[in-house]
């Protein structure tokens, strides 16, 4: 779709044989998701690469998504122009990341990224292509069963976005590992 808005829905049980079944799978430009719940899917939200796409996700809960292979995540944003991720609770990613984004600009504000006591996430926030990223006022907690100890990963797959700048301001990091 193009310029899609989704509000106040629950997505659960989305699975396909190639292990990337998503509550929402967006290939076109423009996506706004508000006040939704995504749980027990292979991916909560999965988007393609679209250079003119702006994505806004706010007030949502993502939990227990992932196929357990480390390649599926609570939220996986492809190479888009901008992601705004605000006021969400992303927890219990099944070995994948609670948020993975390849966006050129990421504005990540006032979220909770949590493993709790029994979560097994990998990175809490993965920005594999770097870019301009603002992490402001978030709570990031790795539980004792987390797959690894990295809370925020930046440009680990190559700094290919045009601007490289990471701002981490007024966040709370908790490691229970």
Positions of the model-derived regions?
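Glycine- and acidic/polar-rich repeat regions and solenoidal domains
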Residues: 1, 7-177
């Amino acid at each position: 779709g193009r310029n899609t808005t989704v509000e106040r829905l629950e997505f659960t049980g989305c699975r396909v044989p190639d292990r990337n079944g998503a509550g929402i799978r967006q290939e076109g430009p423009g996506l706004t998701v508000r006040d939704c719940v995504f749980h027990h899917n292979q991916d909560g939200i999965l988007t393609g690469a679209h250079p003119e796409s702006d994505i806004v996700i706010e007030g949502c809960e993502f939990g227990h998504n992932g196929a357990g292979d480390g390649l599926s995540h609570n939220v996986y944003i492809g190479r888009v122009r901008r992601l705004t991720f605000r006021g969400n609770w992303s927890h219990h990613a099944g070995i994948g990341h609670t948020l993975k984004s390849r966006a050129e600009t990421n504005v990540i504000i006032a979220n909770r990224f949590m493993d709790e006591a029994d979560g097994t996430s990998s990175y809490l926030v993965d920005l594999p292509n770097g870019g301009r990223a603002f992490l402001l006022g978030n709570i990031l907690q790795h539980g004792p069963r987390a797959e690894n100890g990295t809370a925020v990963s930046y440009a680990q797959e190559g700094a290919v976005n045009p601007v490289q700048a990471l701002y981490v301001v007024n966040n709370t990091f908790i490691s229970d590992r």
